[in-house]
């Protein structure tokens, strides 16, 4: 995991290969571990997208929603976070629409009763094998379009 600024720092090594597509899922660490506002976080995300578009204009960009967390796994760390993630995902969807990018709603496929089910996570946030299977099924059809 990383924050958006860390993802930006890694872009040069990724974009030098001029990838056909990039699948971005970013912002969970920023939301969970910093006091950053949605507005500031989205500005960082937009910067990430601008760099990709500028440095690798033929790269197709897919924006993935954030995944839910399992709040009951660690109430202190994750309590109330799914509401924030839902709000952020809505803002990501809007941003993708404004920019003409594909938004992939992984949240809906991954969640049960509004959170990440225990069997799909190893620690409340990171996926287990069962979680990765759900994720792969959600993005497979987009991968084959590339």
Stretches found by the model and what they are:
Residues 45, 49-53, 135:
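Hydrophobic, well-ordered secondary-structure scaffolds
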Residues 25-31, 50-87:
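Active-site segments of SGNH/GDSL-like serine hydrolases
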Residues 1-47, 83-86:
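Conserved SGNH/GDSL esterase-like catalytic core that processes O-acyl groups on lipids
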Residues 18-21, 56-60, 99-102:
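Loop/turn elements at helix/coil->beta-strand transitions in domains of secreted/extracellular proteins
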Residues 68-146:
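Catalytic His-Asp segment of secreted/periplasmic serine-dependent ester chemistry enzymes
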Residues 12, 16, 27, 50-57, ...:
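Sec-exported extracytoplasmic/periplasmic mature domains
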């Amino acid at each position: 995991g990383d924050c958006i600024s860390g993802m930006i720092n890694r872009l040069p090594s990724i974009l030098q290969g001029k990838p056909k597509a990039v699948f971005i899922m970013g912002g969970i660490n920023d939301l969970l571990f910093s006091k950053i506002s949605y507005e500031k976080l989205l500005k960082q995300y937009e910067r990430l997208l601008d760099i990709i578009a500028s440095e690798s204009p033929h790269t197709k960009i897919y924006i993935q929603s954030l995944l839910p967390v399992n709040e009951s796994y660690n109430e202190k760390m994750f309590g109330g976070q799914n509401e924030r993630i839902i709000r952020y995902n809505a803002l990501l969807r809007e941003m993708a629409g404004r920019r003409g990018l594909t938004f992939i709603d992984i949240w809906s496929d991954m969640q049960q009763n509004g959170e990440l089910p225990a069997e799909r996570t190893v620690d409340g946030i990171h996926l287990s094998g069962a979680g990765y299977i759900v994720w792969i099924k959600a993005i497979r059809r987009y991968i084959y379009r590339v």
